[in-house]
C-alpha cells in the first residue's frame, strides 16, 4: 500500500480490505493508518468477515497476528463504513468505466461480491492485476494451493470466470525475490516515519519466523510485485 501511495504512476481511487492474513478489522485499521499518516485523501472501505459463500475462519492461519505487529496500529471500528467494499468497487468502476484497474493483494472476496451487485462490472474494469496462485511451484498452504486463492476459492472461481482480463503474479515469480536483514537495516537507518514503520513491521517476521531459510536469506516479496506490475 505504501508503494502504491508513493508512486506517481498511480492514481488511487480507493482501498478495500478483506479477511486474509489478518482479520478484516486489522486490515482496515492498518490501511486507514497508512492513509492518514501519509496525508492522503483516499477512502478505505472494509469487506465483510468470512468468505464469498461460507465462513472458513476455523481453517485459516492468521499469519500476521503476532504480538509485536498488533502493537503498531490501534484497532479502529468498522461500523461507520456504511457502503462497504463490494458496493464501493461496483460504484467506482461504473463511474470510471474503462479506466479502472484493480490491484489485489489478498483473497478475491470483495470483487466476487461486487460482481453479484453489478453483473455488468466486467465491462467497466480494464483489468485486474493480482498476487495469487502458483503455476509451476508448490503452493504455500497446501502443495497445490497459494494462500490468497485457498482462503476463498469460491470467490477466485467467480472472478476468474468473470471475463475480466487478469494479470497474475504467482508464487513462481515471488519466490525469485528476497527482502532480508541487509535491506531492512538500510531502511531502518532512515528516520522517516514510514521507514521506521516498515522496519518495525518486518522485523518480527525476520526475527521469530519458524522458517530458518527466511531468517537467513530474507522474506520473499509478494504484494509489492503486483503493485509494481500495475505501473506497466
What are these regions (language model features)?
Residues 1-232:
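N-terminal acidic, glycine/proline-rich low-complexity segments
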Amino acid at each position: 500500500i505504501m508503494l502504491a501511495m508513493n508512486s506517481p504512476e498511480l492514481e488511487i481511487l480507493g482501498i478495500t480490505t478483506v479477511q486474509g492474513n489478518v482479520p478484516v478489522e486489522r486490515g482496515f485499521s492498518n490501511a486507514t493508518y497508512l492513509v492518514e499518516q501519509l496525508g492522503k485523501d483516499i477512502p478505505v472501505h472494509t469487506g465483510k468477515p468470512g468468505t464469498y459463500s461460507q465462513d472458513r475462519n476455523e481453517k485459516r492461519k492468521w499469519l500476521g497476528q503476532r504480538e509485536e505487529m498488533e502493537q503498531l496500529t490501534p484497532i479502529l471500528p468498522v461500523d461507520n463504513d456504511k457502503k462497504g467494499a463490494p458496493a464501493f468497487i461496483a460504484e467506482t468502476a461504473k463511474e470510471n468505466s474503462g479506466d479502472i484497474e484493480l490491484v489485489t493483494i489478498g483473497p478475491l472476496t470483495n470483487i466476487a461480491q461486487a460482481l453479484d451487485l453489478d453483473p455488468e462490472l466486467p465491462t467497466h474494469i480494464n483489468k485486474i492485476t493480482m498476487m495469487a496462485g502458483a503455476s509451476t511451484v508448490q503452493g504455500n498452504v497446501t502443495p497445490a494451493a497459494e494462500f490468497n486463492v485457498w482462503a476463498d476459492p469460491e470467490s477466485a472461481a467467480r472472478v476468474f470466470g468473470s471475463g475480466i482480463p487478469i494479470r497474475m503474479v504467482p508464487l513462481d515469480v515471488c519466490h525469485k525475490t528476497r527482502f532480508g536483514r541487509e535491506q531492512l537495516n538500510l531502511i531502518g537507518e532512515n528516520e522517516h516515519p514510514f521507514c521506521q514503520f516498515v522496519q518495525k513491521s518486518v522485523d518480527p517476521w525476520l526475527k521469530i519466523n519458524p522458517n530458518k531459510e527466511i531468517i537467513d536469506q530474507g522474506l520473499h516479496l509478494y504484494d509489492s510485485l503486483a503493485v509494481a506490475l500495475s505501473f506497466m
